[in-house]
C-alpha cells in the first residue's frame, strides 16, 4: 500500500492573476484542486493560501509550471516562475520545488473543457487548475517511466 503522506505533491500553474492548483496524494494521479485569484502580479497574496494547502495535505513536493517559449527560450513569464520558485523555497523550506515544462498545458486544458461543453465563463474559471493538473500528471508520468531521474 502506498504511503499517501510521503507522496503528496502539488502542481501549480502560475498566471498574472490566477494560480491553478492540482493535487496528487499518491504520486500516481493528479486531480485539479482549485484556482486562487489574486491581484495582478501580487504573488505574495498566494503564500497564506498555499501554506494552508501544504499543511492540510502534508505536501512534500511542488511542481511549478515553467512556461518556456516553443523555441525553448526563457521569457518574462519563465523568469517570474523562477522568482516564484525561490519565494516558495524560502517560505516552505521543507517542500521541494521543481520547475516543469508547461508548454501548451493551458491550450490543452481549454480543449478539454470545450470538449466537455463547458461555457466560456466556466472555461475561464477552471482552465488554470486543469492546466496545473496536466503539468503535475506529466511530471508524475515522467517519474514513473524514469524513476532514477526524480528531481
Swiss-Prot record:
Q: Which SUPFAM superfamilies does the UniProt entry name for this protein?
A: Ribonuclease H-like (SSF53098)
Which InterPro entries does the entry link to? RNaseH-like_sf, YqgF, YqgF/RNaseH-like_dom, YqgF/RNaseH-like_dom_sf
Report the subcellular localization: Cytoplasm
Task: Give the E.C. number(s).
Answer: 3.1.-.-
Give any Gene Ontology cellular component: cytosol
Main subcellular location:
cytoplasm
- Its top-level enzyme class, in one word, is hydrolase
The parts of the chain that form a coiled coil are none
CDD domains, sorted: YqgF (cd16964)
Q: Name one GO biological process term.
A: rRNA 5'-end processing
The answer, when asked if Cell inner membrane is one of the entry's keywords, is no
Gene3D superfamilies per record: YqgF/RNase H-like domain
Q: Does the keyword Protease apply?
A: no
Q: Which GO terms describe its molecular function?
A: nuclease activity
What are the UniProt keywords, alphabetically?
A: Cytoplasm, Hydrolase, Nuclease, Ribosome biogenesis
Of which family is this protein a member? Belongs to the YqgF nuclease family.
| Function of the molecule | Could be a nuclease involved in processing of the 5'-end of pre-16S rRNA.
Protein's recorded name: Putative pre-16S rRNA nuclease
Amino acid at each position: 500500500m502506498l504511503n499517501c503522506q510521503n507522496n503528496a505533491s502539488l502542481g501549480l500553474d502560475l498566471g498574472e492573476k490566477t494560480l491553478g492548483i492540482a493535487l496528487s496524494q499518491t504520486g500516481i494521479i493528479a486531480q485539479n484542486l482549485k484556482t486562487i485569484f489574486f491581484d495582478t502580479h501580487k504573488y505574495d497574496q498566494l503564500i497564506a493560501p498555499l501554506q494552508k494547502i501544504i499543511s492540510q495535505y502534508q505536501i512534500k513536493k511542488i511542481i511549478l509550471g515553467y512556461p518556456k517559449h516553443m523555441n525553448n527560450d526563457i521569457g518574462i513569464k519563465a523568469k517570474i516562475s523562477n522568482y516564484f520558485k525561490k519565494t516558495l523555497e524560502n517560505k516552505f523550506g521543507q517542500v521541494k520545488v521543481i520547475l516543469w515544462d508547461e508548454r501548451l498545458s493551458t491550450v490543452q486544458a481549454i480543449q478539454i473543457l470545450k470538449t466537455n461543453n463547458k461555457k466560456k465563463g466556466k472555461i475561464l474559471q477552471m482552465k488554470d487548475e486543469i492546466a496545473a493538473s496536466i503539468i503535475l500528471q506529466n511530471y508524475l508520468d515522467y517519474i514513473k517511466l524514469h524513476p532514477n531521474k526524480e528531481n
